[in-house]
């Protein structure tokens, strides 16, 4: 996926810049989200990979499936189709979303937990993490039973590992060195 990230970055930045000019950042985020979801569906993915279907047909099908009304977003899909890059739409969406959060001075955080967290626990964690990372955070929670217990938090390239698995790994490293 690192290759997709590298390819998608200039597209996401260009689209975000245009969205800023047109004052359409949030509305285009929704359109990109729909496009990213549709492209990941099996039948649509196979259509995109089909060499006998020309680029304009692929773009038209995607535009119709999502129901895009915005001229610039339609043009964006047509450009991606013409360059055989429709498959990077999910990564373009992810990077555009990161740019939107950054623009709004919000960081994205993922809390990995061995067990489901209650809303109260997530709220308390959010308060602590906002202070620790000195930023407003948009938090999502994912369940990872292999953590055994505790949590692991990722904010950008920073990782805060308070899991049992992390502590056992640290102990193992200490004992073997």
From Swiss-Prot:
The keyword Kinase does not apply. Belongs to the ATPase delta chain family. SUPFAM superfamilies: N-terminal domain of the delta subunit of the F1F0-ATP synthase (SSF47928). Keywords: ATP synthesis, Cell inner membrane, Cell membrane, CF(1), Hydrogen ion transport, Ion transport, Membrane, Transport. It is found in: Cell inner membrane. One of its GO terms (molecular function) is proton-transporting ATP synthase activity, rotational mechanism. The gene is atpH. It comes from the Bacteria. This is ATP synthase subunit delta. NCBIfam families: ATP_synt_delta, PRK05758.2-2. F-type ATPases have 2 components, F(1) - the catalytic core - and F(0) - the membrane proton channel. F(1) has five subunits: alpha(3), beta(3), gamma(1), delta(1), epsilon(1). F(0) has three main subunits: a(1), b(2) and c(10-14). The alpha and beta chains form an alternating ring which encloses part of the gamma chain. F(1) is attached to F(0) by a central stalk formed by the gamma and epsilon chains, while a peripheral stalk is formed by the delta and b chains.
């Amino acid at each position: 996926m690192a290759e997709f990230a590298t390819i998608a970055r200039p597209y996401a930045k260009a689209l975000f810049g245009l969205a800023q000019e047109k004052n359409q950042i949030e509305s285009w985020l929704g359109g990109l989200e729909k496009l990213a979801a549709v492209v990941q569906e099996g039948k649509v993915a196979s259509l995109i990979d089909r060499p006998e279907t020309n680029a304009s047909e692929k773009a038209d099908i995607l535009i119709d499936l999502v129901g895009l009304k915005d001229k610039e977003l339609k043009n964006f899909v047509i450009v991606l189709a013409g360059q055989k890059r429709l498959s990077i739409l999910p990564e373009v969406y992810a990077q555009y979303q990161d740019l939107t959060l950054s623009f709004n001075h919000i960081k994205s955080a993922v809390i990995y937990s061995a067990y489901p967290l209650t809303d109260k626990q997530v709220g308390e964690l959010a308060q602590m993490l906002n202070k620790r990372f000195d930023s407003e955070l948009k938090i999502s929670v994912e369940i990872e039973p292999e953590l055994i217990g505790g949590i692991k938090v990722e904010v950008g390239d920073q990782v805060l590992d308070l899991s049992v698995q992390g502590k056992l790994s640290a102990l193992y490293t200490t004992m073997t060195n």
